[in-house]
A protein has these predicted regions:
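Conserved, charged catalytic cores of large soluble enzymes
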Residues: 2-68, 154-168, 178-290, 321-326, ...
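Catalytic alpha/beta core of large soluble enzyme barrels
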Residues: 23, 299-301, 353-354, 358, ...
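Function-dense linear segments that define catalytic or interfacial modules
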Residues: 57-63, 77-154, 162-165, 176-179, ...
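Internal maturation/activation junctions in enzymes
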Residues: 75, 235-238, 338-385, 389, ...
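Terminal amphipathic helices with adjacent charged low-complexity linkers/tails
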Residues: 218, 284-286, 296, 302, ...
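Short, Gly/Pro- and small/polar-rich lid/capping loops
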Residues: 471-473, 647-694
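Short, cysteine/histidine-rich loop/knuckle motifs that typically chelate Zn2+
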Residues: 822-826, 840
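Cysteine-rich micro-motifs
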Residues: 834-844
Length: 847
């Protein structure tokens, strides 16, 4: 039977009704989760269709096992995102026959042991790209790469160290994250590695390693040495009893650099590696291939090479009975029942994932390329298939912790709230592990289970002390899953549940949005007129559960409130002093540590700080996180990475008016030699390259064209910068040459850039370079290029390429004036790393 196709408008309208008027939730669902084919046809009208799709597929798996859940029972758990919410890839992919993609949210790849050859490095690069094209986020560790200056037995003679390969992997991520594909990357390194300082500094250079998150793995010895201001020995190989290279450093100096960089740019994140390994249940099987080497991009799942994880969240708010009322309570009986079912559903999803991987491998087999070309991708998925089936790792987590606490009248960050949260997460741990043991009785334990291997693991010992019967049954019957739990960020998931995200507090209970209006329309209230004369109406947006609090306490959400009245309302609510920017940060870190005791994987959480905090606070937070038993920690200081998170609250003391202005410095005579960046990109299926000449770090000229036209430019992919040299031929003709250094330091010159590119492209490039020379703001240059009325299709493609190349140089946080977010309709787009990001809804678009 032919499936019905819905228009975007039909699906959005029905979803808007489903979400009770929440436009953002409706648009995000249609854009991200509704089933679509490769032509963009939509086959689901609302989340109701999606939930039946998921329920029917999980029920099909259930039917293979005893005590099977029915599709209706499963649907009731999923309906309206009330209780159990598969996250991301499972929500999109389960029952979706239009995609050949994995159901896993994240993967770790790499080598377990010494493998620092160029071949191993290239192999990881290819595997990273192959996973990203199937929707996967990827993490891998660089500690196996030789430090800079080490002797190597090839033509280079010495190793380049970590940083060039960071850039390589980052560029691969940015390359694959085009044309609708996804790319998310985590790079990690041990602090014990002699190049770890260079790794920590790599992202401090603007425009470098922009396609990866970076985290440094800190051992207890380093942390203690940093606190005590004592020396610390780095070595390579990092785990060798007989290292080939050692270096003694001052631990506190390197620690201060980590703190400074995190304060300034939110990276690196820190991973407390000894805690991770000590607490890791899978590492009881390290010698069988389950040695943890890195984490996924968000940090909530430490993994061994070629393992993966699927995520699911339990909506904590839904277990609060009589929310925001004096008699509110948490229904632990229903919660325990649903935790067991969530673990069961996650195990079913592993079976569905194995089917998906089989389909991926079948597609690879059927692809027309020869076996040599396909071998690496096929071998990659074979390894992932084996690990997924052998360990059956799951990622059961939660969302709406902040709303749950508020609904119970508890203020996030207080001792009372933390104590209750710890009780909830202890319940999750015991319930999920009990469910895994029960499934081992019915379905069989994961194949390498061995109770003796796990008997000294601190997490297992904690479970045994809390529930001796569970531990005895586990030893007797085994366990279905090697590890079960995590707490992931639930960004778009929380839009669907209309709650706070993960274990985070509410960002803001009340904020303002602007909507453009026609001042001549009836019932329109003009609050703001911009510099172009457009009129806007400002309206208050309440956090969904803040509205529930208002209704429970006799306040009308539909009424128009003054700012003073809103401030009074917030002060009366349980959200007062409990937002992400004003919770007690040290208490939040301690809360994370206490919850971590009951999570076998890790917790992804960010400590949001105001812009004016000093570096010492970041230092204290990181040290407290280590001492509290956290497995990792990330801080974000407001404005430190402009444009990612921007508070809607304006500075009341800021005076209106134009800022002081001085004319830009104009260099009339071009220096003979300019530093230059090489920017590669793809338009449709054509590969393009741009050479951007820089003066004082600002674009001064640009040469752009096809990389693989008839003339061709023989430029290694590793080349990202060089110099543009202006020369004069014997006949007086001026020409521009590009010179770069290879990895051995030898210079290569490509002569006559003007002859390498299409003449028409060259003439337009001269025009744009003239504008750049006189320091027109980059965003205005892009606007100018975009407005050019050009006739031929090829020159319009070139025009798009120039825009993409120049976007890299827009300062992060620059407003994209006059542009509307396609997701939420607000004019709140800013540039971040060359992409447009909406500060209202978080939607992003690159290219």
């Amino acid at each position: 039977m032919e499936k019905q196709i819905y228009s975007y408008e039909e699906s959005f309208k029905e979803s808007l009704h489903y979400f009770k008027g929440d436009e953002l939730a409706a648009r995000v669902w249609v854009n991200k989760y509704a089933v679509k084919d490769s032509f963009g046809n939509i086959y689901e009208k609302s989340p109701e269709d999606m939930h039946w799709r998921i329920a029917n597929e999980v029920a099909r798996v259930e039917s293979k096992y005893p005590n099977a859940l029915t599709a209706k029972e499963l649907y009731d758990l999923l309906d309206h995102f009330k209780y159990i919410v598969p996250q991301g890839s499972p929500m999109t992919g389960i029952g979706n026959d239009y995609q050949v993609a994995s159901l896993s949210n994240c993967f770790v790849i790499g080598v377990d042991g010494a493998a620092d050859s160029y071949g191993a490095i290239i192999k990881i690069d290819e595997e990273q790209v192959q996973l990203m094209k199937r929707r996967g986020g990827v993490g891998h560790d660089l500690s196996h790469i030789r430090p800079k200056g080490s002797p190597v037995k090839n033509s280079a003679l010495t190793s380049t160290g970590l940083v060039p390969f960071m850039e390589r992997y980052s560029n691969s991520t940015r390359e694959v994250a085009q044309d609708g594909r996804r790319g998310a990357l985590m790079l990690s390194v041990s602090i014990k590695h002699p190049d770890s300082e260079a790794f920590i500094d790599a992202k401090m250079t603007e425009g470098k390693v922009t396609g990866a998150n970076v985290s440094v793995k800190l051992d207890d010895a380093f942390m203690q040495a940093a606190v005590d201001e004592k020396p610390y020995v780095q070595q390579y190989p990092i785990d060798s009893a007989q290292p080939t290279f050692t270096k003694e450093i001052d631990a506190s100096t390197l620690w201060k650099k980590i703190v400074h960089n995190a304060w300034k740019s939110a990276e690196p994140g820190v991973l407390f590696w000894d805690t991770i390994i000590r607490e890791s249940v899978p590492d009881c099987y390290a010698d069988l291939g389950y040695r943890t080497v890195s984490t996924n991009p968000c940090g909530e799942i430490p993994l061994c090479p070629y393992d993966s994880c699927r995520l699911l969240a339990i909506n904590l708010y839904s277990y609060v009975v009589n929310p925001f009322k004096p008699d509110a309570y948490f229904d632990f009986d229903l919660f325990q029942k649903h935790v067991a079912l969530a673990q069961r559903i996650m195990d079913d999803i592993i079976d569905l994932e194995l089917e998906k991987i089989e389909r991926i491998m079948t597609k690879i087999d059927e692809d027309p390329e020869n076996e040599e070309v396909k071998h690496a991708e096929r071998a990659l998925w074979e390894k992932i298939y084996k690990k997924s089936g052998q360990g059956r790792r799951t990622g059961v987590g939660i969302t709406a912790e902040g709303d749950m606490l508020a609904a119970l009248g508890l203020r996030y960050g207080t001792e009372e709230a933390t104590e209750f949260s710890e009780k909830v997460h202890k319940t999750v741990a015991l319930g999920a592990y009990r469910s895994s043991v029960e499934m081992a009785k019915e379905r069989g334990a994961f194949e390498i289970y061995n109770s003796e291997r796990e008997q000294n693991n601190p997490f297992i010992q904690r479970l045994a002390a809390a529930d001796p019967k569970l531990y005895e049954d586990m030893k007797k019957y085994g366990r279905r899953n090697i590890a079960c739990l995590t707490i992931a960020p639930t960004g778009t998931t929380s839009l669907m549940t209309q709650t706070t995200s993960g274990i985070e507090p509410v960002f803001l209970p009340v904020y303002k949005r602007r909507r453009k209006v026609n001042p001549n329309d009836t019932n329109v209230h003009v609050d703001f007129v911009d510099e172009t004369g457009d009129a806007f109406e400002e309206y208050i947006v309440f956090h969904h559960k803040f509205v529930t609090w208002m209704e429970a306490n006799g306040y009308d959400p539909a009424r128009r409130y003054t700012q003073e009245e809103i401030d009074e309302l917030v002060a009366k609510s349980p959200y007062y002093k409990a937002t992400s920017n004003d919770v007690d940060w040290l208490m939040k870190v301690k809360m994370q540590g206490r919850i971590q005791k009951w999570v076998d994987h890790s917790i992804s959480v960010t400590i949001n700080l105001p812009n004016d905090v000093d570096e010492d606070l970041v230092n204290r937070l990181y040290v407290e996180a280590w001492k509290s038993g956290c497995k990792g920690c990330t801080v974000y200081r407001d404005g430190s990475r402009s444009g990612v998170l921007i508070s809607t609250k304006s500075d009341k003391d800021k005076k209106e008016g134009l800022p002081p202005c001085k004319p830009p410095t104009v260099v009339e005579v071009r220096p003979r030699i300019l530093e230059a960046d090489v920017v590669r990109f793809q338009n449709n299926k054509e590969k393009w390259v741009a050479f951007v000449g820089l003066l004082d770090g600002h674009p001064y000229e640009i040469f752009t064209g096809l990389q693989d036209d008839d003339e061709g430019i023989l430029l290694p992919k590793s080349v990202t910068c060089g110099r543009i040299i202006k020369n004069v031929d014997e006949d007086g003709t001026k020409r521009y040459d590009f010179q770069f250094e290879n990895k051995r330091g030898y210079k290569t010159t490509i002569e006559g850039l003007s002859e390498k590119f299409n003449k028409e492209y060259w003439n337009y490039a001269k025009l744009i370079s003239g504008v750049l020379r006189y320091r027109m703001p980059i965003e205005q240059v892009i606007k100018l290029v975009g407005s050019l009325q050009l006739n031929s299709e090829s020159i319009n493609t070139w025009k798009n390429g120039v825009e993409r190349a120049l976007k890299k140089y827009i300062q992060d946080g620059t407003e994209a004036k006059g542009k509307k977010c396609p997701n939420c309709g607000n004019e709140t787009l800013v540039y971040q790393e060359g992409c447009l990001i909406c500060t209202t809804c978080g939607a992003s678009r690159c290219g």
